[in-house]
Amino acid sequence: METLLAGNPANGVAKPTCNGVGALPVANSHAIIATPAAAAATLAPAGATLGRHLARRLVQIGASDVFAVPGDFNLTLLDYLIAEPGLTLVGCCNELNAGYAADGYARSRGVGACAVTFTVGGLSVLNAIAGAYSENLPVVCIVGGPNSNDYGTNRILHHTIGLPDFSQELRCFQTITCYQAIINNLDDAHEQIDTAIATALRESKPVYISVSCNLAGLSHPTFSRDPVPMFISPRLSNKANLEYAVEAAADFLNKAVKPVMVGGPKIRVAKAREAFAAVADASGYPFAVMPAAKGLVPEHHPRFIGTYWGAVSTTFCAEIVESADAYLFAGPIFNDYSSVGYSLLLKREKAVIVQPDRMVVGDGPAFGCILMPEFLRALAKRLRRNTTAYDNYRRIFVPDREPPNGKPNEPLRVNVLFKHIKGMLSGDSAVVAETGDSWFNCQKLRLPEGCGYEFQMQYGSIGWSVGATLGYAQAAKDKRVIACIGDGSFQVTAQDVSTMLRCGQKSIIFLINNGGYTIEVEIHDGPYNVIKNWDYTGLVNAIHNSEGNCWTMKVRTEEQLKEAIATVTGAKKDCLCFIEVIVHKDDTSKELLEWGSRVSAANSRPPNPQ
């Protein structure tokens, strides 16, 4: 059994030479030449390739759809993703939308994946991955990288910025992913892939995996035909800390006269939805939700009082929360948007703030190494039932009036539109709200049990909802997605309505055409907030091109809206439906007017004295 090293003069093999500037070597000076018997003894089965191992891992964790844009560096890898049973490759129109789709998919499935090519694709998807990072979503971003032989050669490659050092893409991803794997050899590829995926799931953040374009089809002994199930060690609370934390929080809350609860967006990453509901059931406290956490707590619960969003909260919600003498916040994020320009009337000394792995009572003490679900479940057993705050809420509560019906041929108003959208919701639907006035109008929708709800508040990237609708609908095929998108946002990412059609999706898109960037107008107006009007239904019809199932309608009155809704929920219930809603450019929610003025004031603060 003889193995010869190529290029070793002792073996009688000439050292390979380069053909000249910009040329490949005649042979690989590091190649191993093995006899057939040796190869049979040392190599893995032909099916145990790097590409197949990665594909199987994605299926194993639930990312059975990968949103991709092909490029020459990832084509071979895409072949292996396509070949994997149980995995579907969804081709997108651009990398940004592929990333947004992986974001939306992760919101439903718990993890998403996208695949792009080196640098030109990677830097294009970067914005979407940054959004997933800010929203605590595990997204596996796979990049087809350069040939492994090109690392360290001082060569200039295409699809780069023209420097011999082509690590710029990696450096960009280092700040917006929790782990980066550069796979340019087979020996540690198995470990790097598994570590990256495990880290994404454990940290609930995106990861970056670059796979050299010449490795996807190669076998290695570590890529077994049936991969060993990946084990992610569970996090556990420190038992002593947990006991002390529960005791401190229970004592604090049990002394309060009218305590309340508020759910925040980090309930998702903590996987604490059921634990939060258990505290609400046991305590008798009224509970609200921060805007970015809508959909994470049960709105059908009898003591749910709405969205707490400072000055733009659900009617009577802020009064109850801010007048409480103690409040339990689970997983909050207090930024300038969620605090309405830092104008919340809350006091730290009254708050128990629980984060995914720590909590603090008032101004102290603070406790680390405790997990939110374990803490909340233990706390539920220690709280005395107290319905005082909820009783106060019931005394002052007056139901909101429905907007009056429009007169015949009267131009449609936005509040009338959302009155009818509310009537469409069920446990078999999900709402995706785009950045803009839809944030505020969709917050008013009372979600039935089982109804999903998603929007991107922390990052707030306009255009996100088109890709997110694609991804969410692909992941949750048992739900019909209702997307509310402004015209300005739609112009950013409209192309992937095409991909929705290719995938046979049946979402309903309400395109709100008011002629500009309404949310920006209310923060700071200017001519840059006016956009060129499109024939949006005509555009979608052109994309449809008689391929797939699609139905469009343009509505200007309430009568037309009723007709459209009857059609999309009846005869066209199995179609992708696109309804362009024409409204006045100044028709906005009162909440946006208030929020915009306060955020504008926060943005306009003068520099501090030096």
From Swiss-Prot:
Keywords of the record? Decarboxylase, Lyase, Magnesium, Metal-binding, Stress response, Thiamine pyrophosphate
**Annotated substrate binding sites:** D72, H159, E520
Give the co-factor note.
Binds 1 metal ion per subunit. Binds 1 thiamine pyrophosphate per subunit.
- Pfam families on file: TPP_enzyme_C, TPP_enzyme_M, TPP_enzyme_N
The record, for SUPFAM superfamilies, names: DHS-like NAD/FAD-binding domain (SSF52467), Thiamin diphosphate-binding fold (THDP-binding) (SSF52518)
Q: Which reaction does it catalyse?
A: a 2-oxocarboxylate + H(+) = an aldehyde + CO2
Q: Which BP terms in the Gene Ontology apply to this protein?
A: aromatic amino acid family catabolic process to alcohol via Ehrlich pathway
Q: Which GO terms fall under molecular function for this chain's record?
A: magnesium ion binding; pyruvate decarboxylase activity; thiamine pyrophosphate binding
State the EC number(s). Answer: 4.1.1.1
Superkingdom, taxonomy of origin: Eukaryota
Residue span of region Thiamine pyrophosphate binding: 437-519
Stated induction or repression of this protein's expression: By hypoxic stress.
- Where along the chain is Mg(2+) bound? D487, N514, G516
Q: Which cofactor does it need?
A: a metal cation; thiamine diphosphate
Any one of the GO CC terms: cytosol
| Top-tier EC class | lyase
Record note on quaternary structure: Homotetramer.
Tell me its family: Belongs to the TPP enzyme family.
Record protein name field: Pyruvate decarboxylase 1
